[in-house]
From Swiss-Prot:
LIM zinc-binding domain span: 5-57, 126-178
Subunit structure and binding partners: Interacts with TGFB1I1.
Record PANTHER family: CYSTEINE-RICH PROTEIN 2, CYSTEINE-RICH PROTEIN CRIP FAMILY MEMBER
The protein's name: Cysteine-rich protein 2
Organism of derivation: Pongo abelii
GO molecular function, one term: metal ion binding
Stored InterPro entries: Znf_LIM
Gene3D superfamilies the record matches: Cysteine Rich Protein (2.10.110.10)
PROSITE patterns reported for this sequence: LIM_DOMAIN_1, LIM_DOMAIN_2
Residues modified as N6-acetyllysine: K23, K138, K144
A Pfam family of this chain: LIM
Region (Disordered): 98-119
Keyword terms: Acetylation, LIM domain, Metal-binding, Phosphoprotein, Repeat, Zinc
Amino acid sequence: MASKCPKCDKTVCFAEKVSSLGKDWHKFCLKCERCSKTLTPGGHAEHDGKPFCHKPCYATLFGPKGVNIGGAGSYIYEKPLAEGPQVTGPIEVPAARAEERKASGPPKGPSRASSVTTFTGEPNTCPRCSKKVYFAEKVTSLGKDWHRPCLHCERCGKTLTPGGHAEHDGQPYCHKPCYGILFGPKGVNTGAVGSYIYDRDPEGKVQP
């Protein structure tokens, strides 16, 4: 039985449906609730069961205060409220508060895109070269962050893809031939890719 689109409440046929948020939608009914931009399944945010584009709409409506209020990538900050009448002359500040302000320093604005560490903490260290791995150049595999060129087979040096390789003692290996030669069952891939070597029995017959 065909399901009903949660946007227009009409029947959704197989040829025109997309599935998102656990429901079937007409392809052109899956739109941002705020700006009506057509969305792709799995490529949008959700609030109260309704779809929103990530930027700027979801960030504007439900993100941290001050982030993306003006649009994608923009930052708006509130001006501090004046407390009491303004004084033009010098003001005495208690020593304790002066030290506290000195320690905290002036408020910082948003960092550049390259310095994602402001929000995520210090970057991890690549297990291959022991240098810092920044967001734009990292791949994650074996529970660690690597530079893209540093994730290569420990034996032959071939560049690997995250999740597409074998592992031994925390080191990455290509499945064939290296892992098979070094750690596979005896006789498998000992010669080259796809080759099999068999031991002979005492009578000289080949053992399968």
